[in-house]
Regions:
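Short active-site neighborhood of thiol/selenol oxidoreductases, capturing the structured segment around
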Residues: 47-66, 169
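Bacterial Sec-dependent signal peptides at the C-terminal "C-region" and cleavage site
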Residues: 19-31
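A short beta-strand-turn-helix
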Residues: 32-53
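Thiol/selenol-based redox catalytic cores and closely related redox-interacting motifs
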Residues: 116-195
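Structural microenvironment flanking redox-active thiols in thiol-disulfide oxidoreductases
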Residues: 66-105, 113-122
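Short, thiol/selenol-centered motifs that function as redox-active sites or metal-ligating centers
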Residues: 59-70, 131, 188-191, 197
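Bacterial N-terminal signal peptides that target proteins for export
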Residues: 2-16
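Structural recognition of the beta-strand scaffold that forms the well-ordered cores
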Residues: 55-56, 86-90, 110-112, 143
Length: 197
């Protein structure tokens, strides 16, 4: 597994944002095919009657992300019955590492392996943990923190004062626009894939 350096959130570069919006306009993201840890190929953004899709960008070794595991499982449970599909997205882990992580942290959602960062590029996600809410048409409706419990690296509140992801999901499910579409996620930087020279 590649080490993932811990850094505060940095806004995605203009190039990534432009590429993400170009992909959205072309609808390319909906046909993304990725492997689950068990090897099955899935299309995490394909519309199958759900009202929204949530992508949780995670790594196995990010302390902030691991602290969020119970809340991620609660969100998955609370919104699944309301028509929301959720996936954990891992960029640099092996299938075995992801399976172990899901079990050890009792994360109750499906996972996909994304070594080429296709979903991160598509959505603009740059850190873990970061959440993205997408419409059935593949439009990013929300991207950012799960809540405001992580204030900065090394500073975490006991309880959040704003539950951003839940607010976004509630708005989407009520047919209303998301008020705060982008928030600053705090966590571990998603490093680009290593290339062989």
């Amino acid at each position: 597994m590649n080490a993932t350096p811990s850094r505060a959130f940095v806004a995605p570069s203009t190039g990534i944002v432009i590429a993400a919006f170009a992909a959205l306009a072309a609808g390319d993201g909906l046909a993304l095919r990725l492997n689950e840890p068990a090897g099955r190929v899935v299309e995490p953004l394909a519309a199958r009657g759900q009202k929204a899709t949530v992508l949780f960008f995670l790594t196995t070794d990010c302390p902030i992300g691991n602290r969020y595991a119970p809340e991620i499982s609660r969100i998955v449970r609370d919104y699944q019955a309301r028509g929301v599909t959720s996936h954990a997205v891992y960029a640099h882990e092996t299938a075995a590492e992801v399976t172990t992580h899901l079990r050890e942290y009792q994360l109750s959602l499906g996972a996909v392996l994304d070594p080429e960062l296709k979903l991160a590029k598509f959505t603009g996600a740059t850190v873990t943990p970061e959440a993205c809410v997408l419409s059935p048409a593949g439009v990013v409706l929300y991207r950012g923190r799960i809540d405001d419990r992580a204030v900065k690296l090394g500073t975490v509140r006991l309880e959040p004062t704003v539950r951003d992801l839940r607010l976004a999901l509630d708005a989407v499910l009520a047919g209303k626009p998301v008020v705060e579409k982008f928030t600053q996620a705090i966590g571990c930087y998603i490093s680009p894939p290593e290339t062989s020279d």
